[in-house]
């Protein structure tokens, strides 16, 4: 029995004989020699938690070094007692913790006292590296210093920790794996919790994190009749409200949501309005073609239209594939467009839009009979009855107008169906699109979403690509049509990356919606078809495509329609992705929920197999698959297969030799869990399969080697991961960019040079340039037709 244990027992006997009241801590005095005793033997013979503190100078307390000849106080805390210490106790109140508390809350205790230089024995004592207890009774200098150091290191580490991109924050999902919403929600909650524990170290432990941005409304079985408002009452109330506000100098309207503002960005329906207002300092110009306003009563739909799915745009031929460029431009909305009407007699009603601006800038515009008016004069604009959603309905013949405010310009147009469509441009001169741009007539391409033509800006003679969206189908609702256009435009204006096309503005003129984008001199498909690309040039273009995909995935977007047709390249060798009509959001910031995509979109040769098999799928591995097919096309100058279905013999051979008879089983495979012993995993033999498709690595005509053997050897590993039939087993974009071959590619890129960017070209290659007659898909189609006619 150690001397320290014997002293403790004697102290306990003395207290029992004296019949002293029970306290939570007892004090005894020991000699300095007792401090060198084995702590483990002491713990084995004692059921209490002991802590040692020196009563010498604070400097020696910080170093936790005993002073020769000094008196050391040993304090015990009974494990069966949770009450606080008495006034005569030598322990400070804030340092009195029972063993049950320490055992149950060791994680908190270790963090509080700092465990970087301390360990903990099995009875809960905090032991430092020198073998002495590290909890001070009074001064607590050493513990306090450890706490401060630990807190500072934690703070600095937290502040320097980078939030991960959304591309790798959620593991790849098996198609149709989120059938059970409850299990999905529980999994996402646990994932979100682990994410917060990893990347939100400064967050208190006693709060609950919000892991979803979706707030559900309460469900109501029935509505009492007294709460039901008819359309007539709603219209009458709106009319009365407008008449009451007629004497006010300014009116403020607010839309209910951001999506309604985007919808009103193009269309607004007005009914009769009559009120007086003062204009707010703007000039505008209008071009009218015989307006004959006949005001209609607003029509309100009772049911909400389901969110439309992207239209299937599948083309087996590369020449007829869709080419719908959109782009990237960081757009700041300073105001919301409002309808302006000219050339109307004062007795006729003029519709007025009733939606608010995103930048909370509300303005009224003056009615005038001239094309341009000063903002100093007051004009009367009759107002009608807006609907509760902020939509009003006009009905007159074709007319268009354009107005400017400061550095922003807006155009307002009307068609025969009573639609009001707005456009917003930055730094516009306040004149219509046809007077600011000249269409050269050269076609760049056409597809299901519209056609793309060249246009020259009159002010500086700069060339742009103008996409003219298709007209609304007869069986297509206006809501679906507007949603498709607004989503594509808003995605384009949100993106800002050198490898993403830039969107300049969107306007409406002559019943057609036009989107102005930056112009790139060549289509990547035309460059590939010229058969002049070197291997280094192909690698440069491939890495630039992957860089653009990495940017999209990092912000939670997936393209879903990657192909050679949707890649353009400028004369400086910078590749840019276009056409975001099929793009979807797969994840939102600070959320671990995966939003699965649905629908078959894209061109057949580039489609991933899960898109053709399952209704819902993770869109990220779809982009990875399509990127690999693009690389194979650039190398082989042909498609590996026409469509990823078993009826295609080439794809069937690609799926063969995998020890499985079902394509669905191959697609739904999951990655093997990591083995704790690599040597054991290599020695483990796989069970023999009874499948008819036995794998044969030496046969280059079946299995993945059917495609990989035609590619350069250094590319086979990473491309093989990108074309894995199972989307859950494919490499994510972060892993692909870290591949040694990808990292070794000398890619042309842009670097910031003051207020502009300069191109850093790759040293091992030059980018191919072709004649402009063959630089775009439209030119190749003309050449092909001419050859067929001959």
UniProtKB/Swiss-Prot annotation:
SMART domains reported for this sequence: S_TKc
Domain of life of the native organism: Eukaryota
Activity regulation remarks: Dephosphorylation by SIT4 activates NPR1 kinase activity.
Leading EC class: transferase
GO CC terms of this entry: cytoplasm; cytosol; Golgi apparatus; plasma membrane
Segments of skewed composition (Polar residues): 16-38, 151-175, 238-248, 290-305, 314-339, 346-357
Effect of substituting residue 357 to A: Abolishes autophosphorylation
Transmembrane portions of the chain: none
Modified residues (Phosphoserine): 47, 85, 90, 100, 111, 116, 125, 137, 141, 257, 259-260, 288, 292, 317, 320, 328, 336, 353, 356-357, 385
Region entry Disordered, spans: 1-68, 151-188, 234-258, 276-357, 666-704, 766-790
Residues reported to bind ATP: 444-452, 467
Function: Nutrient-regulated protein kinase that promotes the activity of at least 6 distinct transport systems for nitrogenous nutrients under conditions of nitrogen catabolite derepression. Under poor nitrogen growth conditions, required for post-Golgi sorting of the general amino acid permease GAP1 and the three known ammonia permeases, MEP1/2/3, to the plasma membrane. Also contributes to the stability and the retention of GAP1 at the plasma membrane. Inversely, promotes the degradation of tryptophan permease TAT2 under the same conditions.
Name of the protein in its database record: Nitrogen permease reactivator protein
């Amino acid at each position: 029995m150690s001397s320290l244990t014997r002293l403790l027992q004697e102290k306990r006997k003395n207290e029992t004989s004296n019949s002293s009241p029970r306290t939570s801590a007892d004090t005894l005095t020991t000699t300095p020699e007792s401090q060198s005793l084995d702590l483990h033997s002491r713990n084995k013979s004692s059921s209490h938690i002991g802590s040692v503190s020196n009563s010498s100078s604070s400097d020696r307390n910080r170093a936790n070094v005993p002073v020769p000849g000094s008196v050391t106080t040993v304090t015990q805390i009974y494990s069966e007692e949770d009450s606080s210490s008495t006034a005569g106790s030598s322990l400070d109140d804030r340092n009195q913790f029972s063993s049950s508390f320490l055992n149950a809350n060791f994680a908190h205790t270790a963090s509080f006292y700092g465990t970087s230089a301390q360990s903990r024995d099995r009875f809960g004592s905090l032991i430092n590296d020198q073998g002495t207890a590290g909890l001070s009774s009074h001064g607590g200098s050493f513990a306090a210093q450890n706490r401060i150091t630990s807190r500072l290191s934690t703070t600095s580490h937290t502040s320097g920790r980078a939030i991960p991109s959304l591309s790798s924050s959620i593991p790849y999902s098996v198609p149709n794996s989120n059938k059970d919403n409850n299990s999905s929600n529980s999994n996402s909650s646990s994932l979100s919790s682990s994410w917060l524990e990893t990347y939100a170290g400064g967050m208190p432990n006693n709060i609950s994190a919000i892991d979803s941005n979706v707030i559900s409304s309460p469900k109501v079985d029935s509505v009492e009749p007294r709460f039901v408002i008819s359309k007539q009452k709603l219209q009458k109330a709106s009319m009365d409200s407008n008449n009451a506000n007629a004497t006010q100098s300014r009116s403020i309207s607010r839309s209910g949501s951001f999506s309604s503002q985007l919808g009103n960005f193009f269309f607004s329906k007005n009914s009769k309005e009559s009120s007086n207002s003062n204009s707010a300092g703007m000039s505008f110009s209008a071009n009218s073609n015989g307006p004959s306003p006949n005001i209609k009563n607003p029509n309100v739909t009772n049911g909400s239209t389901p969110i439309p799915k992207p239209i299937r745009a599948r083309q087996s031929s590369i020449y007829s594939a869709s080419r719908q460029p959109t782009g990237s431009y960081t757009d700041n909305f300073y105001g919301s467009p409002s309808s302006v009407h000219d050339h109307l007699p004062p007795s006729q009603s003029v519709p007025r839009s009733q939606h608010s601006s995103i930048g909370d800038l509300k303005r009224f515009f003056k009615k005038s009979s001239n094309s341009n008016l000063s903002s100093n004069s007051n004009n009367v604009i009759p107002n009608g009855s807006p609907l509760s959603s902020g939509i009003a309905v006009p009905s007159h013949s074709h007319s268009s107008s354009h107005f400017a405010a400061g550095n922003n310009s807006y155009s307002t147009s009307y068609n025969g169906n009573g639609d009001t469509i707005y456009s917003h441009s930055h730094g516009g001169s306040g004149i219509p699109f046809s007077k600011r741009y000249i269409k050269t007539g050269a076609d760049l391409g056409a597809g299901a979403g519209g056609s793309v033509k060249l246009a020259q800006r009159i002010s500086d003679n700069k060339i742009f690509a103008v996409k003219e969206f298709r007209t609304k189908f007869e069986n297509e609702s206006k809501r679906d049509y507007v949603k498709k256009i607004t989503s594509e435009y808003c995605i384009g204006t949100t993106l800002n990356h050198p490898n993403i096309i830039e969107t300049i503005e969107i306007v409406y003129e002559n019943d057609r919606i036009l989107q102005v984008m930056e112009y790139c001199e060549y289509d990547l498909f035309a460059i590939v078809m010229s058969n002049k690309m070197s291997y280094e040039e192909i690698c440069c273009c491939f890495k630039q495509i992957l860089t653009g995909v990495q940017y999209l995935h990092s912000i939670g977007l997936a393209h879903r329609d990657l192909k050679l047709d949707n890649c353009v390249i400028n004369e400086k060798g910078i590749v840019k992705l276009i056409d975001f009509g099929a793009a979807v959001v797969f994840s939102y910031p600070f959320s671990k929920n995966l939003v699965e995509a649905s629908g078959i979109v894209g061109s057949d040769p580039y489609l991933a197999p899960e898109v053709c098999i399952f209704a819902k799928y993770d869109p990220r591995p779809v982009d990875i698959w399509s990127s690999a097919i693009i690389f194979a096309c650039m190398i082989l100058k042909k498609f590996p297969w026409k469509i990823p279905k078993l009826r295609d013999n080439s794809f069937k051979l690609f799926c063969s030799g995998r020890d499985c008879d079902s394509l669905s089983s191959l697609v739904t495979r999951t990655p093997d869990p990591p083995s704790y012993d690599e040597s054991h995993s290599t020695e483990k033999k796989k069970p023999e399969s009874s499948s008819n498709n036995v794998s044969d690595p030496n046969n280059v005509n079946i299995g993945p080697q059917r495609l990989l053997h035609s590619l350069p050897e250094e590319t086979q590993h990473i491309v093989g991961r990108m074309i894995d039939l199972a989307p859950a087993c494919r490499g994510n974009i972060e892993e692909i960019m870290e591949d040694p071959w990808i990292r070794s590619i000398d890619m042309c890129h842009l670097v910031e040079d003051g207020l502009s960017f300069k191109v850093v070209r790759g040293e091992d290659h030059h980018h191919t340039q072709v004649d402009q007659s063959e630089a775009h898909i439209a030119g190749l189609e003309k050449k092909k037709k001419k050859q067929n006619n001959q």
